[in-house]
């Protein structure tokens, strides 16, 4: 469906502009020096949990209105406004990647409100109870889409956490920019529920990041400029972050602009300076939903990791820090992250003709870092494998014990019914509870438990294969 804007686009295309340039307006600016087109991204975790997220409808509508250019949000500081300008004027993006869009009605409102400004839209679907919550709004034509579902993604027994039920995934969108094909990989990786231990789910996120890095390499080798965006639930320097940068060959757009930062120094800054200098999108004290956190808990979890061969960061920062006036609350429990990238046009090749792997294996320091990452990953998998095997065993044991208890309850009922008829009700309820819990644990043990263990072993073997290859390379040196 084409509107007046679409007709204007095609009229401008006749004058020699690509569709991307026409749609992108002033953002698609070609630099005389670098001969690069710029494209502006936004990634935002919208906190759209049904029944759980407070003021969900009002917040999601405020987000949609702001993206559409009709916002009445109140800034918390003029320093946080891009270039010190008007909030609405600076919220003009080319591509918007959203996470936690888990209610269809929220998506319908977003899509409708932003249709004229962002005509290319996509909500991704997977999971059991709801989708992965991933969506994209774009001024740039979408060429193709693909959803990769993480095989290792939490446990069905963690019902109150929900990661397994929503089907955490990677939403891949290929954009037709008219300059160079871009593959945007939007994801919301497994959440940590503790800093240490089993509830931290480090192994799950590391396995997800490992799979992620495989996909990134494939797309890079195919000639795409890859951009990974989303709430990756991993701090800078963590194992998942290393897989997505050192292993996959991407760079952190924020670090490309500001350099690597000492997280301990960022933790000691004031909340406002943490946003300005550390881009702490999560757990900031300036976010009303995280006001009870400690200052040193503020961190950066929302990213745009980019292909350094074809992309260069020229601007980046925290966005959507404003509040909804009548509710006096932030629009999400995360702040958004935005970056403007220069794209090297096709034909201006900067990537070596050899594969990504071969190009990187000539950097000995990087090889040693990757080797260390593999060792850490194997240790991480071994640690969690013990937990997975133990849980599978005890859930299976519960299943067989439930069968014995069920038989025993039936036998006991026949004897007690003659002496105390009312006791039959107790034994029937007991049998029902035993049957339900035993069946659930049995299914988790025999179906999920086996699948998870095999998936972990497969990742371990993949890491070992990569490690053996690096060992061969290092021994040759």
UniProtKB/Swiss-Prot annotation:
Q: Which residues lie on this side of the membrane: Cytoplasmic?
A: 1-398, 450-477
| GO biological process, alphabetically ordered | cellular response to hydroxyurea; ceramide biosynthetic process; regulation of mitotic cell cycle spindle assembly checkpoint; sphingolipid catabolic process
The record's section on Pfam families has: Exo_endo_phos
Q: Where are the transmembrane segments?
A: 399-417, 425-449
Q: Where is this site: Important for substrate recognition?
A: 233
Q: What does this protein do?
A: Responsible for the hydrolysis of the phosphosphingolipids (IPS), inositol phosphorylceramide (IPC), mannosylinositol phosphorylceramide (MIPC), and mannosyldiinositol phosphorylceramide (M(IP)2C). Regulates sphingolipid metabolism in mitochondria, especially the formation of alpha-hydroxylated very long chain phytoceramides. The generated ceramides contribute to the normal function of mitochondria. Also active on sphingomyelin (SM), but this activity is probably not physiologically relevant.
Name of the molecule in the record: Inositol phosphosphingolipids phospholipase C
Species assigned in the record = Saccharomyces cerevisiae (strain ATCC 204508 / S288c) (Baker's yeast)
Upper taxonomic lineage = Eukaryota, Fungi, Dikarya, Ascomycota, Saccharomycotina
């Amino acid at each position: 469906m084409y509107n007046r804007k679409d007709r204007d686009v095609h009229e401008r295309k006749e004058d020699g502009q690509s569709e991307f340039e026409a749609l992108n307006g002033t953002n698609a600016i070609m630099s005389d020096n670098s001969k690069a087109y710029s494209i502006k991204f936004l990634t935002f975790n919208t906190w759209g949990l049904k029944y759980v997220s407070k003021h969900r409808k009002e917040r999601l509508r405020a987000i949609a209105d702001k993206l559409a250019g009709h916002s009445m949000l109140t800034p918390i500081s003029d320093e946080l406004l891009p270039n010190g300008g008007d909030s609405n004027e600076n919220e003009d993006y080319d591509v918007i990647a959203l996470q936690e869009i888990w209610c269809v009605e929220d998506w319908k409102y977003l899509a409708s409100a932003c249709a004229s400004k962002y005509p290319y839209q996509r909500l991704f679907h997977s999971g059991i109870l709801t989708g992965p919550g991933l969506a994209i709004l774009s001024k740039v034509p979408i060429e193709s889409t693909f959803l990769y579902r993480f095989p290792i993604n939490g446990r069905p027994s963690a019902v109150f956490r929900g990661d397994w039920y929503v089907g955490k995934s990677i939403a891949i969108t290929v954009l037709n920019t008219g300059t160079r094909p871009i593959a945007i990989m939007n994801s919301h990786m497994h959440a940590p529920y503790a800093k240490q231990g089993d509830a931290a789910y480090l192994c799950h996120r590391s396995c997800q990041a490992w799979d992620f890095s495989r996909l990134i390499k494939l797309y890079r080798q195919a000639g795409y400029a890859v951009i990974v965006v989303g709430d990756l639930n991993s701090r800078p320097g963590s194992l998942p972050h290393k897989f997505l940068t050192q292993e996959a060959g991407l760079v952190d757009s924020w670090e490309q602009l500001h350099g690597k930062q000492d997280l301990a120094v960022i933790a000691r800054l004031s909340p406002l300076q943490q946003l300005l200098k550390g881009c702490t999108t999560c757990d900031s004290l300036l976010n009303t939903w995280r006001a009870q956190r400690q200052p040193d808990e503020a961190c950066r979890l929302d990213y745009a990791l980019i292909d350094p061969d074809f992309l260069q960061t020229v601007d980046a920062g925290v966005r959507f820090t404003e509040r909804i006036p009548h509710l006096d609350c932030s629009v999400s429990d995360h702040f958004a992250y935005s970056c403007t990238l220069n794209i090297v046009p096709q034909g201006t090749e900067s990537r070596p003709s050899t594969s990504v792997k071969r190009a990187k294996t000539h950097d000995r320091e990087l090889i040693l870092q990757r080797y260390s990452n593999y060792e850490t990953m194997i240790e991480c998998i071994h640690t969690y494998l013990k937990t997975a095997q133990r849980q599978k065993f005890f859930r299976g044991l519960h299943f067989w014990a439930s069968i014995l208890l069920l038989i025993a309850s039936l036998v006991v009922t026949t004897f007690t019914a003659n002496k105390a008829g009312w006791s039959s009700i107790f034994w029937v309820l007991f049998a029902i509870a035993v049957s339900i819990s035993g069946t659930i644990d049995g299914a988790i043990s025999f179906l999920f438990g086996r699948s998870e263990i095999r998936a972990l072993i497969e990742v371990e073997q993949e890491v070992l294969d990569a490690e053996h290859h690096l060992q061969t390379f290092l021994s040759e040196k």
